Regions:
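Extended acidic/charged loop-beta regions that coordinate divalent cations
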Residues: 1-57, 94-109
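Conserved phosphate-binding catalytic cores of ATP/NTP-utilizing and phosphoryl-transfer enzymes
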Residues: 67
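ATP-dependent carboxylate-amine ligase
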Residues: 53, 57-58, 64, 73-86, ...
Length: 255
């Protein structure tokens, strides 16, 4: 809103909160808003419902608020570019998130006894978004695989560790890539410092290589667990998880 005050052009707004933008709607601005669990556009005194979030796979049935934000921005921009609301609605309903369509964006792999999710979150804001999503997920135990990026500030790495400890029950730290001028030990120590802000005896272990960390998480995961791999090399993580899922599928077929 502060930025808008300094702009000299036509401005459209989007928000998760109707109260935040109701005055803008009354003033005649084009607005996309999350209202009554639906994506709605207000434009030229018209109220244009687009879709209920339960019909938008990208939002994970409305559980991923940051994905709703992304959808709002995309819908509003598309609508103002002249695409018909019906076309937008149909596109949202048929765009299915997957490792192929949206690699590294909440890719969920369903194993027989547990699930694994891969996401590209690698900064404090990304970790908080994942934390908010996981708060809606029921699981026996939530296991996180995390790492740090070397060119981040100390406080950012600590914040990632702290948020990880707030959303997971067990953490595997891996750190083989993106050292960017720091040593593996320094990055890990900063993550651990953040973890210990939550609990001094929080359970974690260090497995440097991502492939080995993911394999270990699959070995220790129990029925009803939810594993989250926050990866900075998404293609590798997807390939590894898919390999183990294919192995399990083949084994179940043979038994």
């Amino acid at each position: 809103m502060q930025i808008a005050k300094n702009l000299d052009c036509q401005i459209a707004y989007f928000s998760l909160n109707f109260e935040t933008v109701k005055d803008l709607i009354s003033a005649g601005h084009s607005v996309g808003v999350y209202e009554n669990e639906s994506i709605v556009i207000y434009h030229q005194s018209k109220t244009i419902p687009i879709a209920h979030v339960s019909n938008i796979p990208l939002t994970m049935n409305g559980k991923a608020s940051f994905m709703i934000q992304n959808v709002l921005a995309a819908v509003l921009g598309t609508f103002l570019s002249g695409v018909r609301p019906e076309k937008i609605s149909q596109s949202l309903k048929t765009f299915i998130p997957s490792p192929q369509q949206t690699p590294g964006r909440m890719n969920i792999f369903k194993f027989h006894d547990f699930n694994i999710m891969i996401d590209f979150a690698h900064n404090p804001a990304g970790y908080i978004a994942i934390k908010n999503y996981l708060a809606t997920i029921k699981a026996n135990k939530k296991i996180g695989i995390i790492s740090g990026v070397g060119d981040r500030r100390d406080e950012d790495l600590q914040a990632c560790g702290k948020t990880a400890a707030e959303m997971f029950d067990y953490i595997i730290i891996r750190q083989e890539k993106n050292l960017r001028g720091r040593t593996e030990k320094v990055i890990i120590n900063l993550l651990v410092k953040g973890i210990h802000e939550v609990r001094s005896n929080f359970p974690y272990e260090v497995i440097s290589k991502e492939i080995e960390a993911i394999a270990h998480s699959i070995i220790i995961a129990k029925k009803g667990d939810f594993v989250v791999a926050l990866s900075d090399v998404v293609s590798n993580a997807i390939e590894v998880v898919q390999f183990y899922l294919d192995q399990e599928t083949q084994s179940l077929k043979s038994s």
